[in-house]
Amino acid sequence: IFSKLPYVDKAKVTRALPNRVTITIQESSAMAYVQADDGYWVVDQNCKLLKSVTESELTGLARVDGITPVEPKVGEVLKAGEADAPKVTYLAAILGQLLTRDMASKVTVIDLSDASNPGFTYDGRFTVRLGANENVEYKFGMLQSAVSQLTDSDTGTIDLSIDKRAHFSPG
């Protein structure tokens, strides 16, 4: 099902007597894109490849830097080289939190070049540094709290990698 219908995230079939079948579909959300040798690939919150697109179709999606897809195929989870495999896992955690917290539309670039301290551009004003792939849900909670306490004119870096606290550096 998933290779033929890549935008299906989950499918649940339930049967009710006497002769009724209900199919419930949960749709994948196009969230970001990665660049491969053959073009651009759209990924969902689980790093599943949804489709190959041209540069003109990338509007509204976050660019992912630092991961190069290996043999990308529609409907399959993003595969990267052995060294980049942890980056894909971390990317899925980041995208999942962005979707859950309705923050995806404010992210333009996710940089996984440094797997131990990836970051992303948020709201065009902040560079967010995440640190190691641990407590991701907690870090995004701290990020939302920090952003809510800053003014609309504040710009700079929010570092979530130190001491389980959000550190803001203006600039």
Region spans (language model):
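Amphipathic, non-transmembrane alpha-helical segments in extracytoplasmic/periplasmic proteins
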Residues: 1-6
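Charged, solvent-exposed interaction patches on well-folded alpha/beta domains
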Residues: 10-171
